[in-house]
């Protein structure tokens, strides 16, 4: 029996955190300030983190995932993560990404975020003999049936498929201000979870929350697509594209066909205008 443990690491987070750690403001005189990054410091920080993760999780190997410059979610919702576009990215970010790719190798799937890549690799686990652990700080991974290590909090989570599906529905109702999509007005995560616990973790509960707020089924579906991380059966590795988008299990064939034009828009070739915006 193969007892190998592989860490699936969110390299986007490592790149950002190391770049901010290595960045410094320098005052040369009363009116002259500059910003610089010590790439050697950033590289050392990443190496130390990887060793810490390996010891903490008793891991044998790791895979680093990076987000593609294109993102299928922007075709569905152009304002997805738009709130991040005006933020100043650390100046060493691109060189650090390039160094990780050269030093360790990084995995990028066309049109997907690093989170999607990790979710796909994690949900392949039933067909593999190794144990896989997602390593990140992103609570969105509670919406994936997986083992998830939140390294900011030092917490290890074993998430069942039932728990993951319920978390996804909760995010659909509550929205995610960090990712820039709003859910039902006046309903946060606590209230959304209470609704699902009381009325059942179903699409019917989600739709009623939207309907009561004067919102449409399509708005609910769009938010569900924003919140959902792609799993193994939904991505075509050979052709490097999405096979299909998540749909409520309660949907009939006729209901699915109603949204087929939207689905076909993102399961084909994606437009170049979905490129990740320049951070400056």
Model-derived segments and spans:
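Extended two-metal-dependent nuclease catalytic cores across DNA- and RNA-processing enzymes
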Residues: 2, 33, 59, 83-280
């Amino acid at each position: 029996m193969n007892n190998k443990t592989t860490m699936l690491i969110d390299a986007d987070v490592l790149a950002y955190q190391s770049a901010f750690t290595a960045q410094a403001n320098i005052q040369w005189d009363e009116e002259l300030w500059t910003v610089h990054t010590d790439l050697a410091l950033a590289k050392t920080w990443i190496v130390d983190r990887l060793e810490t993760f390996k010891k903490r999780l008793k891991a044998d190997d790791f895979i680093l995932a990076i987000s593609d410059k294109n993102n299928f979610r922007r075709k569905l919702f152009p304002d997805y993560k738009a709130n991040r576009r005006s933020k100043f990215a650390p100046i060493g970010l691109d060189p650090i990404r390039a160094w990780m790719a050269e030093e360790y190798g990084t995995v990028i799937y066309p049109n997907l975020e690093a989170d999607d890549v990790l979710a796909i690799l994690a949900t392949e686990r039933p067909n593999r003999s190794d144990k896989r652990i997602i390593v990140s700080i992103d609570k969105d991974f509670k919406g994936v049936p997986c083992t998830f290590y939140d390294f900011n909090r030092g917490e290890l989570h074993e998430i069942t498929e039932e728990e993951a599906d319920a978390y996804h529905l909760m995010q659909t109702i509550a929205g995610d201000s960090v990712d820039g999509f709003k859910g039902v007005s006046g309903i946060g995560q606590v209230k959304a979870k209470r609704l699902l616990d009381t009325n059942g973790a179903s699409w019917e509960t989600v739709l009623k929350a939207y309907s009561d707020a004067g919102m449409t089924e399509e708005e609910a579906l769009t938010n569900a697509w924003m919140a959902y991380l792609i799993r193994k059966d939904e991505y075509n590795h050979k052709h490097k594209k999405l096979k299909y988008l998540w749909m409520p299990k309660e949907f009939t064939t006729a209901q699915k066909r109603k949204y087929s034009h939207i689905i076909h828009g993102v399961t084909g070739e994606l437009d170049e205008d979905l490129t990740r915006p320049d951070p400056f």
